[in-house]
Amino acid sequence: MDSRRSLLVLALIFISFLVYQQWQLDKNPPVQTEQTTSITATSDVPASSPSNSQAIADSQTRGRIITLENDVFRLKIDTLGGDVISSELLKYDAELDSKTPFELLKDTKEHIYIAQSGLIGKNGIDTRSGRAQYQIEGDNFKLAEGQESLSVPLLFEKDGVTYQKIFVLKRGSYDLGVDYKIDNQSGQAIEVEPYGQLKHSIVESSGNVAMPTYTGGAYSSSETNYKKYSFADMQDNNLSIDTKAGWVAVLQHYFVSAWIPNQDVNNQLYTITDSKNNVASIGYRGPVVTIPAGSQETITSSLWTGPKLQNQMATVANNLDLTVDYGWAWFIAKPLFWLLTFIQGIVSNWGLAIICVTIVVKAILYPLTKAQYTSMAKMRILQPKMQEMRERFGDDRQRMSQEMMKLYKEEKVNPLGGCLPILLQMPIFIALYWTFLEAVELRHAPFFGWIQDLSAQDPYYILPILMGISMFLLQKMSPTPVTDPTQQKVMNFMPLIFMVFFLWFPSGLVLYWLVSNLITIAQQQLIYRGLEKKGLHSRKK
């Protein structure tokens, strides 16, 4: 297969990939739930049982707002229920060079995205008639220098029972401990069920065909390591899964919020949809906890609200790092990301790291590239003999095919040898594509000059234009036996078509393709020199 036909194959694979991406974005079939849910569509918390449906009243006024802060995030807590209504990520700007922290969780008139938790059940303190109004002295709580963790207890007392909702902040971590300590001095046993949920305005996933981004739910259970559950899925079928281990999450491009309940007990994962208010919730409900009179009980859970940091999330909960979704190319994307990170740690620039990774990839593929050009050179030499066979055997395709295979064997030529490097390069390209869409480390990562965000498109389209020029040069420098005028015109337009597609791709990905083309041109000239010495190639066309 000659270079230009290889380019056509590459274009077809590339366009098919983009079409598939858009189809996945537009048509995500609903997941069938494992059992019928007992959660009502208007509920704000899960029902404790089918016959005892409890809910939070949406009309309640807000309590006092307190602020919790460590070195990576700043949280706002509503003392009415103890919900997390805001999370500002101090190490991530909202926009490039804005100096304003990115706010992940937030509650405004236009948009709601909050993390709720509470106690329901027979003696629950979060009911349709009201929620616990916690008390605490002070409004601002900050992890001090040299302090590794900070516990902030909210207090609520009712009928001889003392409830403490304790928030635990840790240095350098987006993992927030949310524990309940219950002291029952009421004279009789009480029963409660813990729950945690993420409440989010129903929105469509953003992005475009080149850079689609997912906003929606996800969960992990004992049977399913990781599964997206979109807002459309929630509207079609409320989720209800019983599992011993697992978590629920809402994904938003480079960021994620996730409730992780006690992994040693059975929990129900669920969703609730409120079409009237255009809101959906995904959460968990724990088992009934009985606290005898005169006894104490502690119920643990944690909330991750922050960037998709794979290494940290892997230590918080099993499979939470899978929210960094590399798609089917994960087995390539993970080592590539590791290599990118390793090199970036040395060169301190993600753009230079991309260039270095490109050099490594092209060096690894060089033997195949050399075999590709050698195979194409031999195929060109065989063209007269192949044409003679076509004329000799005419319509006898079976005989012609047999004779051609015999010729390939005698001349030691692999007719598919030119395809292999192309087929290997596409998965690498797709893996890098998903890396740029998913790895928060590349968000707002500068290169130099006008490229200040390698995860975004080139604002002046300089890299895509250079990439198109490099493809044009590579095509012109590659000899081809293509004689059909129509096919020739299609091939001539390929660099332009690719350039247009790449206008909206992450600039880091375009940089990879540009450098790859330049290296291929250099490798091509080196290989051609060797082929000329063997009489397999002539620079004269």
Curated annotation (Swiss-Prot):
GO terms, molecular function: membrane insertase activity
Location in or out of the cell: Cell inner membrane
Transmembrane segments: 6-26, 337-357, 416-436, 454-474, 495-515
GO terms under biological process: protein insertion into membrane; protein transport
Region of interest (Disordered), ranges: 34-56
One cellular component term from this protein's GO annotations in UniProt: plasma membrane
Entries under InterPro entries matching the protein: Membr_insert_YidC (IPR019998), Membr_insert_YidC_N (IPR028053), YidC/ALB3/OXA1/COX18 (IPR001708), YidC/Oxa/ALB_C (IPR028055), YidC_ALB_C (IPR047196), YidC_periplasmic_sf (IPR038221)
Keywords: Cell inner membrane, Cell membrane, Chaperone, Membrane, Protein transport, Transmembrane, Transmembrane helix, Transport
Keyword Chaperone found: yes
Membrane topology: Multi-pass membrane protein
Keyword Transmembrane helix listed: yes
Family (UniProt): Belongs to the OXA1/ALB3/YidC family. Type 1 subfamily.
Function: Required for the insertion and/or proper folding and/or complex formation of integral membrane proteins into the membrane. Involved in integration of membrane proteins that insert both dependently and independently of the Sec translocase complex, as well as at least some lipoproteins. Aids folding of multispanning membrane proteins.
Family matches, as PANTHER family: CYTOCHROME C OXIDASE ASSEMBLY PROTEIN COX18, MITOCHONDRIAL, OXA1
Quaternary structure and interacting proteins, as annotated: Interacts with the Sec translocase complex via SecD. Specifically interacts with transmembrane segments of nascent integral membrane proteins during membrane integration.
Protein name (database record): Membrane protein insertase YidC
Lineage: Bacteria, Pseudomonadati, Pseudomonadota, Gammaproteobacteria, Pasteurellales
Gene: yidC
